[in-house]
């Protein structure tokens, strides 16, 4: 299709009046400022969580404990066909369809591993700052299925599971723990069995300190979730205003 000068002159285009454009521009500028502030709040809260975890892991009550004393492999297959979830660095355990728009699982997922709420999942998949894979607690309210390549573990308590989750949120902690256990295979693949994952030590505070940590970190995490929700709302508002400029 070729459009020439006369054709373009006859083309009717709808756009907001100058006053409306100025109003939308002003609102967009205000929302951009708010998004920037909100992003900074979220980054600061994430740094706070990291700082709290590092401080607790160096508490005077800490003792070094084999992970095998805190976790046991679940070994439950997906015979009930629970929905397939992935594991994300930033979002934790996520529903593939809800977050990725589609499922990347096999047609038959009965051989997938089941993770209960509170279980620890180890992905064995390198990503970003985590070259040996990521470790996350399943915070989804129901049982989920995950890749058969993942290790799934039941913790001796949910307080311990939460502590392990936040401990391994640190790229440095994850790398220091895992690099001694892993053998790199062909094409940089990670070779580690589910049991081998449990064969190193982590610092664990006493029960009183652990309970205090869980209460504090849970409160901060709940606040962080609200702040992220607000950021998503602001971003949605911005997208809406942008579309209105071209209605």
Task: Describe each region flagged by the PLM.
Residues 1-19, 143-149, 183-208:
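A short glycine-rich beta-alpha junction/loop motif
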Residues 2-5, 117-172, 193:
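A short beta-sheet element
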Residues 18, 47-51, 55-79:
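Non-catalytic DNA-recognition/assembly elements of restriction-modification systems
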Residues 23-35, 53-55, 213-224, 246:
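Hydrophobic structural patches
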Residues 70-107, 139, 146:
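DNA target-recognition patches
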């Amino acid at each position: 299709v070729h459009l020439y000068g006369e054709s373009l002159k006859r083309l009717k285009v709808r756009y907001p009046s100058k006053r409306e454009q100025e109003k939308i521009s002003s609102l967009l500028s205000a929302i951009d400022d708010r998004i920037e502030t909100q992003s900074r709040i979220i980054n600061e809260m994430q740094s706070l969580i990291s700082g709290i975890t590092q401080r607790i892991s160096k508490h005077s009550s800490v003792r070094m404990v084999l992970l095998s004393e805190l976790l046991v492999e679940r070994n439950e297959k997906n015979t009930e066909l629970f929905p397939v979830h992935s594991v994300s660095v930033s979002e934790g355990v996520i529903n593939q369809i809800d977050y990725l728009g589609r499922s990347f699982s096999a047609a038959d997922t009965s051989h997938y591993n089941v993770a209960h709420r509170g279980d620890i999942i180890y992905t064995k998949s390198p990503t970003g700052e985590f070259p040996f894979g990521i470790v996350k607690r399943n915070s989804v309210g129901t049982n989920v299925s995950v890749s058969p390549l993942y290790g799934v573990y039941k913790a001796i308590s949910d307080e311990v599971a939460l502590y392990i989750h936040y401990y391994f949120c640190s790229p440095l902690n994850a790398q220091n723990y895992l690099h001694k256990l892993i053998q790199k295979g062909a094409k940089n693949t990670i070779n580690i069995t589910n049991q081998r994952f449990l064969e190193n030590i982590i610092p664990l505070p006493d029960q009183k300190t652990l309970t205090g940590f869980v209460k504090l970190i849970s409160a901060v995490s709940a606040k962080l979730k609200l702040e992220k929700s607000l950021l998503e709302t602001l971003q949605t508002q911005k997208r809406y205003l942008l579309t209105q400029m071209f209605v």
